[in-house]
């Protein structure tokens, strides 16, 4: 996958939270329920496409749920996403489908709040389990990228130059991946629907896992059509 003049390949990675569903609008815990985007969510998404606020993608990944796939289809028409099965949202268990007002008198919910979100969701998933699952999905994404490079090299076309990768996922997936790879608190990386984070992955020949570099909120990246060169100047739920 490496040509003779390169000992490092860097790609731009954008993690995008899907646009809004009705449950998102109502503040409900939306995990394993496979809900579609709401009409308002679709309208906002289509406007974002018209405004060209998202980067282009040489390769597109997505979680398997409808809200991610619909977002990916509208953001990147004509591109078929590679689906990562591990990138479903966290299983909220007994809290699924409920909002704060409905749960406010539930002692199990109060215990979960008091724990700072550390306790496992009753009848659901723990944060540690969810992070492990999300990271396993990321490793699968990296595997797919390496296979693309290797297939292009084997075909005699040389390395395929992947410069920009987008992944449409859930808010929880973004928090899981960034807290794992960048450090900090899990909830430091919350993203609203349609928002996310952008940065670079640096792959070094023979150096194992890629390094995460310079990730920042997508809202801080002012672009009409993002290119890697523009973004690398000046190195420095549901």
Describe the function of each predicted region.
Residues 2-4, 11-79:
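Active-site-proximal alpha-helix that buttresses catalytic centers in soluble enzyme cores
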Residues 6, 53-86, 111, 202-238:
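Conserved histidine-centered catalytic loops in small-molecule metabolism enzymes
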Residues 19, 63-65, 86, 165-172:
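Short, well-ordered beta-to-alpha junction loops that form the rim of enzyme active sites
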Residues 57-64, 149, 159-168:
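Short glycine-rich phosphate-binding loop at a beta-alpha junction
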Residues 66-68, 137, 173-174:
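Alpha-helix capping/helix-boundary segments
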Residues 74, 176-180:
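Active-site signature of alpha/beta-hydrolase-fold catalytic machinery across serine-
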Residues 75-136:
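Phosphate-handling substructures
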Residues 182-213:
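Domain-level recognition of soluble alpha/beta enzyme cores
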């Amino acid at each position: 996958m490496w040509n003779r003049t390169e000992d490092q390949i860097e790609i731009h990675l954008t993690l995008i939270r899907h646009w809004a569903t009705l449950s998102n609008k109502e503040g409900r815990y939306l995990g394993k329920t496979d809900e579609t985007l709401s009409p308002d969510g679709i309208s906002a998404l289509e406007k974002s496409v018209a405004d060209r606020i998202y980067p282009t993608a040489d390769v597109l990944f997505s979680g398997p749920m409808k809200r991610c796939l619909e977002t990916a289809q509208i953001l990147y028409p004509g591109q078929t996403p590679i689906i990562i099965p591990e990138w479903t949202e966290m299983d909220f268990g007994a809290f699924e489908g409920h909002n704060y007002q409905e749960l406010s008198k539930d002692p199990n919910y109060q215990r979960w709040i008091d724990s700072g979100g550390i306790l496992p969701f009753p009848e659901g998933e723990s944060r540690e389990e969810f992070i492990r699952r999300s990271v396993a999905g990321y490793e699968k994404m990296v595997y797919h990228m390496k296979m693309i490079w290797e297939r292009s090299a084997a075909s005699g076309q040389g390395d395929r130059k992947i410069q920009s990768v987008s992944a449409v996922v859930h808010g929880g997936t973004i928090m899981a991946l960034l807290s794992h790879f960048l450090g900090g608190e899990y909830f430091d990386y919350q993203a609203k629907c349609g928002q996310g984070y952008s940065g670079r992955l640096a792959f070094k020949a023979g150096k194992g896992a890629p390094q995460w570099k310079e990730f920042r909120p997508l809202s801080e990246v002012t672009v009409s059509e993002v290119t890697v060169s523009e973004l690398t100047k000046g190195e420095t739920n549901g």
